[in-house]
Amino acid sequence: SEKPPALFDLTSLQREANRQLGFTAQQTLDYTQALYEKKLVTYPRTDSRYLTDDMAPLVPELVSVIQQSFQIQADVPAPVNAAQVINSKKVTDHHAIIPTKTAAGYDISSLPSGEQAILTLLAVRLICAVGTPCHYAETIVEAECAGQKFRTKGKTVTDMGWRQYAGKPVEDAEKNAEAGDLPELCLLYTS
């Protein structure tokens, strides 16, 4: 199984924004700072990937309003396991970067495209981080022929879990799983 990803701190947000969107670290910081000044995200200059214990009761409602506002698989209510993202001991000055309730009621289309992209990245990560694990079934086949050993393995997704809310990474997981699917096996010859 694959655990849900952690929430973003500034460094992990910058890495992901570079990987997915091609933004530089400075661009990501600038967009996130602008969103913070509009009260759409929490404080961006943080090194924590967790929320504080006192935020636990707020997480389910925040996830629900963010999921609806951003239309993140809105027809499938996201499961919320807030305990995965709550750990006051791992929070120093500021908790992880997350969207605020203000973001849920905001006309996101009025934002510049870079800010929209970062806000959406943060919204999707919040939904994924509190989700259930993604489960796979794996098959390994080993065979020997003419003294040569062959081995192959394939993976099939049995429960998408948090990945069903992740957008493009879901398609990648499905494509990878399909590429690794093994056909039904039958024994044709033994010596």
Question: Which functions belong to the PLM regions below?
Answer:
Residues 23-80:
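Extended, well-ordered alpha-helical scaffold/bundle regions in very large, multi-domain proteins
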Residues 40, 80, 93, 145-147:
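Accessory interaction regions appended to the cores of large information-processing enzymes
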Residues 46, 56, 85, 102, ...:
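Short capping/connector residues at structural and topological boundaries
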